Amino acid sequence: MRVSQSLIPFAIIALVLSFVNAYDPSPLQDFCVAIDDLKGVFVNGRFCKDPERVDAKDFFFSGLNVPGNTNNQVGSNVTTVNVDQIPGLNTMGISLVRIDYAPHGQNPPHTHPRGSEILVLVEGTLYVGFVSSNQDNNRLFAKVLHPGDVFVFPIGMIHFQLNIGKIPAIAFAGLSSQNAGVITIANTVFGSNPPIYPELLARAFQLDANVVKELQAKFGSI
């Protein structure tokens, strides 16, 4: 499905805004292109490529125009562009993703432990939101987004997106880290390795222990 050209500026603006207050430490040199050479200089968790050997391909990625495969259990696909895809992002404190959603597909509740997120919807209709911390009484902040709408997910907050439309949806998001990380709640709690004691989860979630074991089996923990 072709993305409307009129919405591209919205996506660009949203991503630029995410650059303004990057979460990662600021660089002290022009760039530090990540490399797996153990003889390099170690900066921000990665080794730096010799600046004399850096070229344009170290700052380039191609493929965000390609829809992700949403034929899976949650009906969504995240195409990530972080320091692993563009080594020149090392120390820059930014990254981005493309998210494709099948009709009624979702990006299930998850957190990014190292970065905030700003999302712009390009196509479709999404129900999105995040839940604040215990200190803030776990308030839900949610909106229905239409093409051109933007929503922010604060760092560390559990958040989600659900395609409530009858057609596929497409969104782009900027993150304030070169590698914001992701913790999907259900996979983490019920799919940990080794598994968390079922009795603990049963009491925490007010469930029968057998139900917990079924969930752990579903998510691959046992």
Swiss-Prot record:
Please give the SUPFAM superfamilies that the UniProt record associates with this protein: RmlC-like cupins
Question: Which pairs of positions does the record mark as disulfide bonds?
Answer: 32-48
Where it sits in the cell: the answer is: Secreted, Extracellular space, Apoplast
Q: Taxonomic classification, please? A: Eukaryota, Viridiplantae, Streptophyta, Embryophyta, Tracheophyta
Q: Which family does it belong to?
A: Belongs to the germin family.
Keywords (alphabetical) are: Apoplast, Disulfide bond, Glycoprotein, Manganese, Metal-binding, Secreted, Signal
Q: Which residues form the Cupin type-1 domain?
A: 62-213
- Cellular component terms per the entry's GO annotation: apoplast
Is Disulfide bond among the key words of this record?
A: yes
Query: What residues bear carbohydrate chains?
Result: 77
- Quaternary structure per UniProt? Oligomer (believed to be a pentamer but probably hexamer).
Q: Does the keyword Chaperone apply?
A: no
Kindly provide the name given to this protein in its UniProt entry.
Answer: Germin-like protein subfamily 1 member 16
Q: Which Gene3D superfamilies match?
A: Jelly Rolls
Q: Where is the signal peptide?
A: 1-22
Job description of the protein:
May play a role in plant defense. Probably has no oxalate oxidase activity even if the active site is conserved.
Record's InterPro entries?
Answer: Cupin_1, Germin, Germin_Mn-BS, RmlC-like_jellyroll, RmlC_Cupin_sf
Molecular function in Gene Ontology: manganese ion binding
Q: Name one Pfam family in it.
A: Cupin_1
Superkingdom of this protein's organism? Eukaryota
